[in-house]
Regions:
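Conserved redox-cofactor binding core of oxidoreductases
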Residues: 42, 47, 78-173, 447-449
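A glycine-rich dinucleotide-binding beta-alpha-beta segment and adjacent secondary-structure elements
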Residues: 154-167, 351-385, 397-494, 500
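N-terminal FAD cofactor-binding segment of flavoenzymes
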Residues: 8-69, 87-103
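A generic secondary-structure signal for well-formed alpha-helical elements
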Residues: 13-16, 23-29, 69, 96-107, ...
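Glycine-rich loop(s) and the adjacent beta-strand/alpha-helix scaffold that form part
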Residues: 11, 22-25, 45-48, 162, ...
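Mid-to-C-terminal "cap/lid" subdomains and adjacent gly/pro-rich loops that border
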Residues: 193, 201-367, 519
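Short, solvent-exposed loop/turn and secondary-structure capping segments
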Residues: 27-31, 58, 64, 73-74, ...
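N-terminal Rossmann-fold NAD(P) dinucleotide-binding loop
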Residues: 2-3
Length: 521
């Protein structure tokens, strides 16, 4: 987010100082310079998996998926506590094209109008996601950053504190550490863009000196921490391959990739009290005979016989079934029972050869018309899910404690969303779901797969009322004249989308706001 914002401001004639804890090189050791954290829940990813120092930040860990939020995400929903944004979706959507271009999704994606879920259909089938051709933003924009006349980059410089002026109404300076040195940086406006956890840590540290700032000790700062639930609860079997193909990866005219997903409509969400959820197709691993395809089993057996599968085949796609159910006999059964084996083998071999030669490696379409169904679901924001500073200040920087919680509503909504989708598939004679878990264990299966910490949403949430949020509709910290926050930590709700695209769009919007107010600060 910081890189997008820096370019936006610089292109409009503003002078920018970019403070980066890492450098231009390979991924740094975040723990060495950033503060430590204690994860209090098994449902939150480890710090080394979610933090990355260096130009481009966590884009080095990012897969490249770009997805827009939906209009319903911005509504106050009766069945979703603490929902509603103070701005409409259009305020962000106006910047999606520019954000897609910055993220490397190609010209076609940048000019595409985001599809809206129709109220008439219970399940939408045209929800697009775009893929960046180069997710690592350091590689995309590093040279441009070095050559920018309006951006001064200071690497290996970690912001360790925020110093306010005498009445606490403005930021006077940022406290910066670089190696053994400590110094201050001053500017007219300051933007925290260090990721949700680090943004929250810096504000919580400032709150220790100013206890009534940012909503006070029991206010919204650090609370409403949420992300997404993702995993597999079912496979999907189609009655015809053409429908699966409409949901599969394809190239646009400029060479970028996109695909479409399945999603309950806004009316269906309201009717069934669902959190926003989407589904997409994944291939079974070719080593898992649960795919039901003789051609995929033949490909696996051939690679295994030649000793190549462990090197180039293993991990082509996920496999949620038990290893003991993946024996040779089941693969041979797939081969014998496949009436379209020869034609399917040609298709699979062609896909596999393209997959190995292409720049981006996507999974294989299944001639057996059975796919894993991946869900990606919203988490309800709750104040009990939070981050806070430990009382122990050992090491100089207080440890950040992460108490990230899923709620029963989150789990129930995932299960119910599958039921709504299955009813629609069968009613429309499109296909059906094959559950991977017995009905009485489905909630347990969803909870066991529930893990986030990558998206870091809500801990500096946006609201018009300082009692309900940390920043206002312009991403300015309440009661602070010149302090702003960029990133998904300002989202009041998570929606179904991974937050990269809307967070960049919101950062670009902030850049325009900073230009408008530059002469007043």
């Amino acid at each position: 987010m910081g890189l997008a914002l820096a370019f936006k401001c610089a292109n409009q004639g503003l002078s920018v100082i970019l403070l980066e804890s890492g450098g231009f090189g390979d991924r740094g050791n975040a723990e060495a310079r950033l503060g430590s954290a204690e994860i209090l829940t098994p449902h939150h990813a480890a710090l080394e998996a979610i933090r990355c120092q260096g130009i481009g930040g966590t884009s080095r860990l990012w897969g490249g998926r770009c997805v827009a939020l939906d209009d319903i995400d911005f509504e106050k929903r009766d069945h979703v506590a603490n929902s509603g944004w103070p701005i409409p979706h259009a305020e962000i959507a106006n910047y999606y094209g520019e954000a897609l271009t910055f993220l490397g999704c190609g010209i076609d994606a940048a000019h595409a109008k985001n599809a809206e879920r129709t109220a008439q259909a219970e399940i939408a089938t045209d929800m697009p996601e775009y893929w960046s051709a180069e997710p690592d933003l350091r590689r995309q924009h590093g040279a441009r950053l070095r050559n920018s006349a309006n951006i001064r980059v200071y690497t290996l410089c970690t912001v360790s504190g925020i110093r306010l002026d005498s009445d606490g109404a403005r930021v006077a300076a940022l406290v910066v550490k670089s190696g053994d040195r400590s110094f201050e940086v001053t500017a007219r406006s300051y933007v925290l863009a260090g990721g949700g956890l680090e943004n929250a840590r810096l504000l919580l540290l400032a709150q220790r000196d100013w206890p009534h700032k940012f909503g006070g000790p029991n206010g919204p700062l650090g609370r409403y921490y949420c992300g997404h639930l993702s995993g597999y609860l079912a496979a999907i079997r189609f009655n015809q391959q053409s429908f699966a193909k409409s949901l599969w990866y394809r190239k646009s005219s400029d060479g970028s990739h996109l695909r479409h997903r399945l999603a309950p409509s806004p009316d269906a969400q309201r009717k069934h009290a669902l959190l926003n959820t989407v589904f997409w197709l994944d291939s079974f691993s070719i080593g898992d005979p649960a795919h039901g395809s003789g051609a995929l089993s033949m490909l696996y057996l051939g690679l295994a016989l030649l000793g190549l599968y462990p090197r180039i085949g293993n991990g082509l796609a996920p496999s949620p079934t038990e290893p003991r159910s993946r024996g040779l006999r089941r693969h041979l059964s797939n081969v014998v029972r496949d009436p379209r084996l020869l034609s399917s083998m040609f298709s699979v071999t062609w896909q596999f050869s393209k997959r190995r030669l292409g720049q981006r490696a996507f999974a294989l379409m299944n001639p057996g018309e059975r796919y894993l169904l991946r869900y990606h679901a919203e988490q309800v924001p709750t104040s009990e899910s939070r981050v806070f500073l430990a009382d122990d200040d050992r090491g100089g920087t207080p440890k950040l404690c992460v108490d990230f919680r899923f709620q029963p509503q989150d789990i129930d909504s995932v299960v119910k969303s599958h039921e709504v989708l299955d009813d629609w598939l069968q009613r429309e004679k499109i296909g059906r779901l094959d559950y991977l878990t017995d009905a009485d264990r489905q909630s347990e299966a969803v909870l066991n797969q529930a893990l986030d910490g990558y998206h870091q949403i809500g801990v500096t949430r946006m609201a018009d009322d300082p009692k309900s949020g940390v920043v206002d509709r312009d991403c300015r910290v309440h009661d602070m004249a010149n302090l702003f926050v960029a990133g998904s930590s300002v989202f009041p709700t998570a929606g179904q989308a991974n937050p990269t695209l809307p967070a960049v769009a919101l950062a670009l919007r902030l850049g325009d706001h900073l230009r408008r107010i530059a002469s007043t600060l």
